[in-house]
Curated annotation (Swiss-Prot):
Annotated InterPro entries: SOD-like_Cu/Zn_dom_sf, SOD_Cu/Zn_/chaperone, SOD_Cu/Zn_BS, SOD_Cu_Zn_dom
An example Gene Ontology molecular-function term: superoxide dismutase activity
Keyword terms: Antioxidant, Copper, Cytoplasm, Disulfide bond, Metal-binding, Oxidoreductase, Zinc
Name listed for the protein in its UniProt record: Superoxide dismutase [Cu-Zn] 4AP
Record text on subunit structure and interactions: Homodimer.
Localisation per UniProt entry: Cytoplasm
Species this protein is from: Zea mays (Maize)
Function: Destroys radicals which are normally produced within the cells and which are toxic to biological systems.
Enzyme Commission (EC) number: 1.15.1.1
Details of cofactor binding: Binds 1 copper ion per subunit. Binds 1 zinc ion per subunit.
Residues the record lists as binding Cu cation: 45, 47, 62, 119
Catalysed reactions, semicolon-separated: 2 superoxide + 2 H(+) = H2O2 + O2
């Protein structure tokens, strides 16, 4: 079993810890929580670069090794890093429990060393008709991010 973790932070008080677990070549389980969010849906993605020198802006685009368009997690045509939305309750906390087969922790397309990002707005899953729908899901600003690192 391979485990990884990302500690999310921001200058706006949004913070959280996201855990990644993968058994063999199976799908990766993503669990954890993020606090300090406005209630509602927030885009949740793996971004290509594990670089936070300029905050979350330097994490690059969504992780997309197959050069596909943005989509929903269940879509065949999607970025590998498209994990859909997380929902923050009235308390501003989003509890995360996702399983995905396109974000391995080992091999040539591993997400280790990349970043996980929570966005300000809902991800329209590529179906919103906005000019950004097919690239970012029109999910708005990046409110928190963290680099995905191997865990003991």
């Amino acid at each position: 079993m391979v485990k990884a973790v990302a500690v999310l932070g921001s200058s706006d008080g949004v913070k959280g810890t996201i855990f990644f677990t993968q058994e063999g070549d199976g799908p990766t389980a993503v669990t954890g929580s993020v606090s300090g969010l406005k209630p509602g849906l927030h885009g949740f993605h793996v971004h290509a670069l594990g670089d936070t020198t300029n905050g979350c802006m330097s994490t690059g685009p969504h992780y997309n090794p197959a050069s596909k368009e943005h989509g929903a997690p269940e879509d065949e045509n999607r970025h590998a890093g498209d994990l859909g939305n997380v929902t923050a309750g009235a308390d501003g906390v989003a509890n995360i429990n996702v399983t995905d087969s396109q974000i391995p922790l080992t091999g040539p397309n591993s997400i280790i060393g990349r970043a996980v990002v929570v966005h300000a707005d809902p991800d329209d899953l590529g179906k919103g008709g906005h000019e950004l729908s097919k690239s970012t899901g029109n999910a708005g600003g990046r409110v928190a991010c963290g680099i995905i690192g191997l865990q003991g």
